């Protein structure tokens, strides 16, 4: 089995790195010079993540080779210090990868079946302000989906917005807000989805605090945040079992109380 360097060890003072990573996220970007590019979040088998980008000159190559969900071996890539602007702050790694014409990428077999979702407790959202800095993953039950609304965006144009609410096993709720085509997609996904086990998973969303109000927003990088209804992962199966256990206990308590 091939040996790879750990993503957590990456720094710019070496140039011979050899990593095996999953393309956890991939989305389209426009660089400051106006040229198109791709952005990525790579994760290794240990769960360490790093942000990466490529420019227009090698766009087609990495679009073809680095497919979201696939695993790749990367060598001859560049490393620079992470950009701490909020838009680029998608991992906690101190460096970020630059893919260029010298970079070699080849597909490899998966090194892990882990979905690499790190679910945040709802209490942490309200009690730990540092969570505001980085994207978070959430799992909960969908309890309310509003109507699609049209509002003014920061660019001066109009966009669709959608508000919805999820709750955890302790019935604590968080309000969520999605924008643009993503809002429309979530609205379509949630048609007819209700009931005690309407479990949804949100990955890479941002915590937004305005005065004393906390909301969860999709990331300003279009295509980065994701929304899933009952995805086929172990965490959802465990969550569903806990819900049914809670319902069963509530019914037993009610029956015993009525005796």
List PLM regions with ranges.
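Single-stranded nucleic acid-binding proteins centered on OB/S1-type folds
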Residues: 1-259
């Amino acid at each position: 089995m091939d040996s790879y360097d750990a993503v957590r060890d990456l720094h710019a003072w070496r140039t011979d790195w050899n990593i095996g990573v999953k393309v956890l996220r991939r989305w389209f970007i426009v660089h400051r010079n106006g040229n198109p590019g791709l952005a990525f979040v790579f994760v290794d088998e240990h769960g360490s993540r790093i942000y990466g980008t490529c420019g227009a000159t090698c766009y087609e190559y990495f679009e073809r080779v680095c497919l979201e969900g696939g695993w790749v071996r990367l060598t001859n890539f560049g490393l620079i210090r992470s950009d701490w602007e909020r838009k680029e702050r998608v991992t906690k790694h101190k460096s970020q990868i630059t893919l260029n014409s010298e970079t070699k990428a080849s597909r490899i077999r998966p090194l892990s079946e882990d979905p690499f979702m790190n679910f945040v407790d709802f209490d942490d959202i309200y009690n730990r302000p540092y969570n505001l800095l980085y994207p978070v993953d959430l799992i909960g039950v969908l309890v309310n989906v509003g109507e699609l609304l049209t509002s003014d965006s920061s660019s001066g144009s109009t966009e669709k917005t959608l508000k919805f609410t999820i709750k955890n096993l302790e019935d604590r709720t968080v309000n969520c807000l999605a924008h643009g085509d993503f809002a429309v997609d979530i609205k379509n996904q949630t048609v007819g989805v209700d009931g005690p086990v309407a479990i949804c998973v949100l990955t890479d969303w941002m915590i937004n605090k305005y005065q004393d109000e906390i909301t969860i927003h999709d990331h300003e990088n279009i295509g980065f945040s994701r929304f899933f209804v009952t995805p086929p992962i172990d965490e959802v199966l465990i969550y569903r079992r806990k819900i049914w256990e809670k319902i069963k206990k509530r019914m037993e308590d009610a029956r015993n109380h009525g005796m």
